[in-house]
Amino acid sequence: MTLELLQAQAQNCTACRLMEGRTRVVFGEGNPDAKLMIVGEGPGEEEDKTGRPFVGKAGQLLNRILEAAGIPREEVYITNIVKCRPPQNRAPLPDEAKICTDKWLLKQIELIAPQIIVPLGAVAAEFFLGEKVSITKVRGKWYEWHGIKVFPMFHPAYLLRNPSRAPGSPKHLTWLDIQEVKRALDALPPKERRPVKAVSQEPLF
């Protein structure tokens, strides 16, 4: 199984109700050998049109956050908990998230084998932490998931609604957080392709 083959399979997914309203499947994009993987919640309107993750206003802000920290977007792999746009941009429902992560995200993680995962927002953080969480309480802290470092951060869409840069504001905290991610990235040794612990619920073939 390759990432390209997995992406091709995802284009015809009918596993949950989200397929009914989608225009495009938004599988993910970036470096298939990335050390850093960023996982959002779900595609928005612009992403649904283009088939690419984080290309709308939140994505443009994410680009600026990465650039400010000296992390080239093309070196990162970016995807979402669900690959199809939820109606009215609502958060994915638990059953939708479970179906999509079991079918696609876990396999993406196995194939890419990132060393750091940054979940953006509560829905993504809850998947990796395994419980209902408040993003304000878990952001900016290191966790471990199947041997991979996990560092939750605010979703850029939340930052757009809270534009203040004052000390202690979400934007200020995000600036501190992304610098911590950059320090951790810089401290990693050159990545070697290695077998990782199986995390998917289904075979890879």
UniProtKB/Swiss-Prot annotation:
Product-inhibited by apurinic/apyrimidinic sites. It catalyses: Hydrolyzes single-stranded DNA or mismatched double-stranded DNA and polynucleotides, releasing free uracil. The keyword Iron applies. GO terms for molecular function: 4 iron, 4 sulfur cluster binding; metal ion binding; uracil DNA N-glycosylase activity. Belongs to the uracil-DNA glycosylase (UDG) superfamily. Type 4 (UDGa) family. GO terms for biological process: DNA repair. [4Fe-4S] cluster binds at C13, C16, C84, C100. The 4Fe-4S cluster may have a structural rather than a catalytic role. Does not appear to be essential for enzyme activity. PANTHER family: TYPE-4 URACIL-DNA GLYCOSYLASE (PTHR33693:SF1), TYPE-5 URACIL-DNA GLYCOSYLASE (PTHR33693). It comes from the Bacteria. Removes uracil bases that are present in DNA as a result of either deamination of cytosine or misincorporation of dUMP instead of dTMP. Can remove uracil from double-stranded DNA containing either a U/G, U/A, U/C or U/T base pair as well as from single-stranded DNA. Specifically recognizes uracil that is flipped out from double-stranded DNA. Monomer. This is Type-4 uracil-DNA glycosylase. CDD domains: UDG-F4_TTUDGA_SPO1dp_like (cd10030). It holds the Pfam family UDG. Its EC number is 3.2.2.27. Uracil binds at G40, E41, G42, F54, N80, H155. Keywords: 4Fe-4S, DNA damage, DNA repair, Hydrolase, Iron, Iron-sulfur, Metal-binding. InterPro entries: UDG_Type-4/5, Ura-DNA_glyco_family4, Uracil-DNA_glycosylase-like, Uracil-DNA_glycosylase-like_sf.
